[in-house]
Amino acid sequence: MAADPDCIFCKIVAGEVPCFKLFEDAETLAFMDINPVHDGHALIIPKAHFPTVFDIAPEAIAAAARTTRRIAQAVNAALKPDGLNLVQSNGPGAAQSVGHFHFHVLPRWNGDGLLVNWTPKPGDHAHIGEIAERIRQHL
């Protein structure tokens, strides 16, 4: 997909907006989030513009996943967090802040107060089965 002239991430890829670059290859760019949740909060993007997971080409998401793994390993080695979250949001209902597919690498420390956890509760198996069937119809 071509670059979007209004996309901040496309402007970063083009060198029009500076970033704290961590890694770059032919298909992806990894850089520090300038509004970090914690030290080490990094973003990984495909260089091509894809708004969401629903739009991204299979080869582009594979490249982004490879780079995400590499950055996660480096963050883990450099900062030694207690854990690490990978976050990828799609659309306003999921709080996607930039309309360019991206992964967040979020190092976590015990007691850091970041709330991305939910409490598992037993689901209704009949309902879960119905939802599974609805999803399978689209595969």
Where are the language model's segments positioned?
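HIT superfamily nucleotide-processing domains
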Residues: 1-139
